[in-house]
């Protein structure tokens, strides 16, 4: 119980700090999965916490001509991936973009993304008032086969098949 209360107080303090500095969202633990030669797509993952209700409505990156918000969902006992127009970011709640769930797809990669590199991302957020803002993020590139915690991934090949992803 004390851990929950402590975590809640930290979240409230962080949101108050955001509001005081005019920021509307923070991004934590942003990372991109490294690619293998000839692979033309990969995933980007992170935690986004908005100070007020917002939506993630777009992503841009100089590393990829095409960047989209995607969702993985179990449908008829098959994992399916599809692009989504937006992702709701409730006020004060961390929304995790992770392998096997919501994530950013970086597609048509002109060159491999190597572990240890950094990939710049620009997130486009929209408030309830229709106002848009961008957040610049530097995502670290992690080796193929890792998850957000740097542990070996059980689903490491999941994004490897996106190399032939077509739109």
Which residues make up each language-model segment?
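Compact, glycine-rich, soluble single-domain proteins
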Residues: 24-167
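N-terminal signal peptide c-region/cleavage motif recognized by signal peptidases
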Residues: 14-22
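Compositionally biased, intrinsically disordered low-complexity segments
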Residues: 7, 13-15, 138
């Amino acid at each position: 119980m004390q851990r929950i209360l402590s975590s809640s107080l930290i979240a409230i303090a962080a949101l108050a700090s955001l509001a005081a500095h005019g920021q509307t969202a923070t991004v934590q633990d942003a990372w991109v999965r490294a690619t293998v030669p000839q692979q033309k797509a990969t995933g980007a993952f992170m935690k986004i916490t908005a100070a007020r209700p917002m939506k993630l409505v777009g992503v841009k990156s100089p590393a990829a001509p095409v960047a989209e918000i995607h969702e993985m969902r179990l449908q008829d006992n098959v994992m399916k991936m599809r692009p989504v127009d937006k992702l709701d970011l409730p006020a004060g709640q961390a929304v995790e973009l992770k392998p096997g769930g919501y994530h950013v797809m970086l597609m048509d990669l002109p060159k491999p993304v190597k572990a240890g590199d950094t990939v710049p991302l620009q997130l486009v957020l929209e408030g309830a008032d229709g106002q848009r803002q961008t957040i610049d993020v530097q995502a670290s590139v992690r080796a193929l086969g890792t998850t957000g915690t740097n542990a070996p991934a059980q689903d490491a090949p999941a994004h490897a098949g996106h190399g032939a992803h077509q739109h």
